[in-house]
Amino acid sequence: MRLSILLGLLPLAPRPPAVDAVEQRSEPAPLIEAQGEMIADKYIVKLKEGSALASLDAAMEKLSGKADHVYKNIFKGFAASLDEKMVEVLRAHPDVEYIEQDAIVNINAEQRNAPWGLARISSTSPGTSTYRYDDSAGQGTCVYVIDTGVEASHPEFEGRAQMVKTYYASSRDGNGHGTHCAGTIGSRTYGVAKKTQIFGVKVLNDQGSGQYSTIISGMDFVANDYRNRNCPNGVVASMSIGGGYSSSVNSAAANLQQSGVMVAVAAGNNNADARNYSPASESSICTVGATDRYDRRSSFSNYGSVLDIFAPGTDILSTWIGGSTRSISGTSMATPHVAGLAAYLMTLGRATASNACRYIAQTANQGDLSNISFGTVNLLAYNNYQG
């Protein structure tokens, strides 16, 4: 069944018998209620692998004013406003794998004061004040910051940052969160990988929130866009965002990782098991928890078996909008440490997109952290600089 035929059903709002023209299924496709703050009448429709998509462009024309997003890369599907009848028609269609209600996603940050994280990831013990690193510093890599945007004109980025996609009227970072994360990844003073290229993808509004359907579209964009960029040493996606569990978001993140992008995500700031949050609960990507300067799990950081690594996340000083700096806390701040470290290691030839998270875990400082719950890794990111 071609996607154009499938999506062509939507504008008609037919009663269930309208699917008689296509092959019937024995049971309707699952209808998943996303955890968290759901959005009324907004749905993400995931098609089965192997569904023919030759007429996707025609389908998009038929959905003019109906589809919010059409996904072509990380998985096949779309997001749209659907009433109950439309949902039931689509659930009966043999090409639909599942339908999930859209939900709100937020940044994972809190306000705080004081810098220290870079020194910690280049040392085997806490309390140091010097960041030690190889001067290659992530050169030849690209890091996508999927967030509130990036203030590319900030002097700390030295012309290495640019906005490449926005889902809002303005590409400007009116929040600061994305710029802060980008600074920890690759700014001149506060960055782990000081020579990487930074690409901003604005999926969250200036209040720091957005829809899962938009997050998925941002990942879909990255999966295609990076192939047209000059990133010979590797590509990373940093996502310091999260919300309640979502099958669609997890699937998108897993497929972005599989496409050749190292995906680092925030564990979340709920002091709870990260398996109940997305994209943190996706096992094939790199889920990052936060620590403080005393090597304690940050009081807010999520935990559990889905975490891969911890990194500094309390009182992290980095770039801010308006050409300034600010110190904030969250697993949002820990994640760019790991994203930057992945880019750094890729340039050195020690890691690739497929194995970077595993390599970081294998070479981490082990057993140094306190306030770690049973079943959670006791691993703190470390760059293993030997110079």
Curated annotation (Swiss-Prot):
Propeptide residues?
22-108
Q: Name the domain of life this protein comes from.
A: Eukaryota
Q: Enumerate the Gene Ontology biological process terms.
A: proteolysis
Binding residues for Ca(2+) 2:
124, 368
The entry's function note states: Serine proteinase.
Occurrences of domain Peptidase S8 (ranges)? 115-387
Question: For the Inhibitor I9 domain, which residue ranges apply?
Answer: 42-107
Q: What is this protein called?
A: Proteinase R
Q: One GO term of the cellular component aspect?
A: extracellular region
Q: At which positions is Ca(2+) 1 bound?
A: 308
List UniProt keywords, sorted A-Z.
Answer: Calcium, Disulfide bond, Hydrolase, Metal-binding, Protease, Serine protease, Signal, Zymogen
Q: Which organism is it from?
A: Parengyodontium album
